[in-house]
A protein has these predicted regions:
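Extended interfacial segments that mediate partner engagement and assembly in macromolecular machines
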Residues: 1-5, 110-119, 126-130
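Intrinsic-disorder-associated, low-complexity terminal segments enriched in Asp/Asn/His/Tyr and depleted
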Residues: 134, 140-141, 148-155, 160
Length: 164
């Protein structure tokens, strides 16, 4: 989901904990996990880490990630990344894109409505979180700037995602 929204995210269940911690430290990434053990290890190393609830769904997960990181929960197809290899997609036609690295094709199909619905629900959940914790919501410009910075080569905001 983070890649769909244009964020540079590493995802793999193949990495052992030490490798995830090393990548997060060397590349200034945020670890997102349901694994309490790696969460504890990351805190001991003073790394940025978000512990997701083991029973939450994608809507609540996205809202919580946005709450903790201030990212923008929206999809701009000009920034969308390949869900397989993380490369920024290239437009090849109206509502069609291709990954320049792995050559996977993407298009706006019926699944697009589901993506939009989940993003809308996640933003609604984010507002509830912010109201619950009495935090004033960042402007859309601030959140969008974070995503745009993620797509530039300077000072990028990176996310290391590990689902357990």
């Amino acid at each position: 989901w983070l890649r769909i929204m244009g964020y540079d995210a590493i995802y793999s269940n193949k990495y052992e904990d030490w490798k995830i911690l090393e990548i997060a430290q060397n590349q200034n990434r945020i670890i997102i996990t349901r694994d309490r053990s790696i969460y504890t290890k990351s805190l001991r190393r003073h790394l940025k880490c978000i512990l997701l609830s083991p029973d939450s769904d994608i809507v609540k997960d996205l809202a919580y990630i946005a709450y903790k990181t201030r990212i923008d929960l929206s999809v701009n197809v000009n920034y969308t990344r390949c869900t397989e290899c993380n490369s920024v997609l290239e437009k090849i036609g109206e509502n069609k894109w291709i990954c320049p690295r792995c050559k996977k094709n993407y298009w706006k199909g019926r699944h697009w409505r589901t993506i939009e619905e989940i993003i809308i629900k996640a933003n609604s959940e984010l507002l509830k979180l912010e109201e619950k914790h009495d935090i004033r919501r960042a402007s859309n410009n601030t959140r969008t700037e974070l995503r745009n910075r993620s797509n530039s080569n300077t000072d990028s905001k990176k996310v290391n995602l590990r689902e357990v």
